[in-house]
């Protein structure tokens, strides 16, 4: 009987250990992908152009003209985080400012079609950051939105200082949508007036019209 119990205890320990090791592996796989950050820029440029052809050309031209700029701040847990920002197409008549937040495994480049929509169609200033462990931002793992909200809350006054608007919208996609929704539950400046979330499957050519309608409805509701 003692022998049976001994083997049962050993078997149970092995199962528990295997479960712990598997859990750690899956956690690292999800939160610490090997290819990330700067090493992943080229892939995301292709993804941006697959979502809307010509996106990176538009981005590169504005950057070459000095219209689109980069900036960094010290974010959550003292990691440096990066963002790009661009003024409205007609800056003197800008309608507000949008912060566009990307999803899991992406960076500021992927959803350029949203940046372009806000800037060129809605005449909004836009700031679009890299979340931690993405793009040009530092970080030791993906934050899955919950802690990313602290960085977004730091970007909000930065964008306000740059553009000096009295109306701001936060628009997130996938994990970025989760980030935006969790940010919306915190105490924010009164000029943050609108929150838009988009599913990861929403793409131009299929559901971009609904994205535009959702955003424009939100923007028209400003008071």
Regions found by a protein language model. Name each.
Residues 94-103:
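Short beta-strand element of the alpha/beta-hydrolase
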Residues 163-174:
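Alpha/beta-hydrolase fold nucleophile elbow
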Residues 141-163:
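Alpha/beta-hydrolase active-site loop
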Residues 115-138:
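Conserved alpha/beta-hydrolase
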Residues 76-88:
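A short loop-to-beta-strand scaffold at the N-terminal edge of the catalytic core in hydrolase folds
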Residues 104-118:
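The serine-hydrolase catalytic nucleophile loop
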Residues 182-223:
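Hydrolase active-site cap/lid region
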Residues 20-74:
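An N-terminal hydrophobic leader/cap segment in hydrolases
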């Amino acid at each position: 009987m003692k022998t049976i119990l001994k083997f049962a205890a050993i078997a149970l320990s092995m199962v528990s250990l295997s479960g712990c090791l598997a859990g750690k592996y899956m956690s690292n796989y999800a939160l610490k992908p090997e290819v990330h950050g700067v090493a992943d820029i080229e892939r995301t440029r292709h993804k941006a152009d697959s979502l809307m052809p010509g996106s990176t050309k538009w981005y590169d031209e504005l950057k070459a003209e000095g219209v689109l700029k980069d900036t960094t701040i010290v974010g959550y847990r003292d990691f440096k985080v990066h963002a790009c920002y661009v003024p409205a197409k007609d800056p003197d008549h800008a309608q507000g400012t949008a912060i566009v937040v990307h999803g899991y495994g992406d960076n500021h480049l992927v959803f350029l079609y949203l940046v372009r929509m806000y800037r060129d169609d809605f005449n909004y200033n836009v700031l679009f950051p890299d979340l931690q462990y993405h793009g040009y931002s530092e970080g030791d793992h993906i934050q899955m939105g919950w802690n990313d909200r602290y960085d977004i809350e730091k970007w909000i006054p930065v964008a306000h200082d740059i553009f000096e608007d009295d109306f701001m919208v936060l628009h997130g996609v996938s994990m970025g949508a989760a980030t935006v929704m969790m940010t919306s539950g915190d105490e924010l400046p009164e000029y943050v007036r609108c929150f838009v979330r988009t599913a990861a499957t929403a793409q131009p050519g299929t559901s971009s019209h609904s994205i535009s309608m959702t955003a424009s409805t939100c923007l028209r509701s400003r008071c």
